Each structure stands twice: as structure tokens, then as C-alpha cells.
């Protein structure tokens, strides 16, 4: 494993002009968040300023699903992935990308894009949102099993990013959903794919949870300790230890989470090698990203732990980026 000193950012978004146009044509971001201005140069500036050597780009929610028409959503996904591949090809050791997909509710379209993006464009993984559709189709829903099978067959890296809940009413006008609700959406879908057996069935998938797993490390044992002893536990048959084992199987990025309180818990919870650096640029304010990065850089890790989280763990997950010794 390389000891390359620069950070490897697995949570970094791009916002091409054609996506901004799609958002604006469909009423804006349903989460209530402001659409940021983005250029490749702005990403490179952030990378230089906080010491990022490699970035995996992804399109955040709502992604291609902003189009309700399935053909328009499929077209936007294809355009996004073609754009991302061109950025990657401009500097393959500096950039990678997670493929954007149409809504998983349009199964054939989503599977087609998985095959094209991974098999033809050589995407580094795919982005899945925490839920799809007008109801609670979280990622453990039976309708998504064929999609998970496609990903499992390819040993895909699956980057799980939160999206807005069914209820888009805000807690307060000053608290848009990405600020406070998104981590809970991540926890919901993570527990759903555990209790539905999805994690155990599709073991080849390497699943990254955004934002240090939301509240999963804090709440996993609450579910695990009670579930086997309730009527609800009969449907999955998982023991307390099995639920925790599956919860620990995830990878966790540190986007907006590199602080002493979150790190203190996550280092105890996550498996060795499963914590990754993330920035959440450009949706997070640059000052916020700098704050969390500085907090992370000041945290009292061993040098080996710091090097692993900064880059080594990501290089193990994405071997094409490993730097020759």
C-alpha cells in the first residue's frame, strides 16, 4: 500500500451546467439546498488548498431522478457519466467517478446504465441514493434485488448518498434537509439493507456510507440488542452479533464529520481500513470543509492511522490509484 501523503477524497461532487439546467427546469433541489456554482477549476483549487491528491467525483441527489420522465432521466444519467469519464480521462491518477443512475424504480434503465458505466466507461463505482420514489423505497426494498445482483456480479463499490425524505417539510426555515435530516436518511437505508439481508446476500459489494454513516454507529446497537427479542425480528432472523457485524462491514467517509466527537466513536466502531476521507465539495461551504479538515488533521492518530485514512484505505478499495513504490 502506498504511503503517498496527499488525501484521497471519495465524497466530492460535480455540478455541470447541464445538471443545473435540469434542476432549474424541474423546480430546483427538493431538499431546499442552494445549487452551488461549480467548475473543475474550483474543485482543483479546493484540492490544492487542503491537500487532496485524488478525487472521485459523484453527482449528488436528486441526480438524474430530477426528471420524472424515465427516458429523460436515462438520458441525463448517460450524459453525466460520459462527462465524468472525460474528466477522468484528462488525468486518470487525479480523478475518478461514481456513475450516476436513473431511478432504481426504472429497473431496466438502471441496470442498463450500470452495465454501460462500469463495463464500458470503467467507472470506479456507482452512486445510489438512500431512497427512491414517492414512498419509502429504501435500498433494501425487494424491488431492488436485481440491481444489487448486477452490482454484486461486478464487485462494485457502491457510494450511498442521502436524499430528501418523503416529507420535505423543514424542521425550521434555517435547517434545510441536508443540514440535519440527511444523516438520518443514511441510517435508515443502512439499517434497511442490513435487516432485509441485502448486505449478507450481496457480499461482493463494497458499500460506502456518507457522512460517517449518519447516526448508524451511534444507534446500531440500539436496534441490534432489541431486534432479536421482538416480533419484528422474526422476519430477518438476525442475531445481535450478526446485525452489528453487518453494520461494521460498511465503509465510512468523513465528509463533514472530521471532528473529535465523531472520530472518537467511529474509530471504535468501524473495521480497520474502512474509514475514508471526504470533503463534500462544493455543496458544503468551503469554510466548513476547512474546519473539519483542520479538526481531522489535528486529531491524535498514529501516523499509520492518519496515512491510512488520508489515502491508504482508499487505495486498497480502488487499486488502480495505488502509487508504485
Swiss-Prot record:
Transmembrane segments: none annotated. GO terms for biological process: secondary metabolic process; terpenoid biosynthetic process. GO terms for molecular function: 6-methylsalicylate decarboxylase activity; hydrolase activity; metal ion binding. The keyword Metal-binding applies. Its EC number is 4.1.1.52. One of its GO terms (cellular component) is cytosol. Zn(2+) binds at residues 11, 13, 161, 280. Gene3D superfamilies: Metal-dependent hydrolases (3.20.20.140). Disruption phenotype: Abolishes the production of arthrobotrisins A to D and arthrosporol A, and accumulates 6-methylsalicylic acid. Leads to altered growth rates and the development of much more fluffy aerial hypha. Shows significantly increased ammonia levels in fungal mycelia. It is an enzyme of class 4 (lyase). Belongs to the metallo-dependent hydrolases superfamily. ACMSD family. This is 6-methylsalicylic acid decarboxylase.
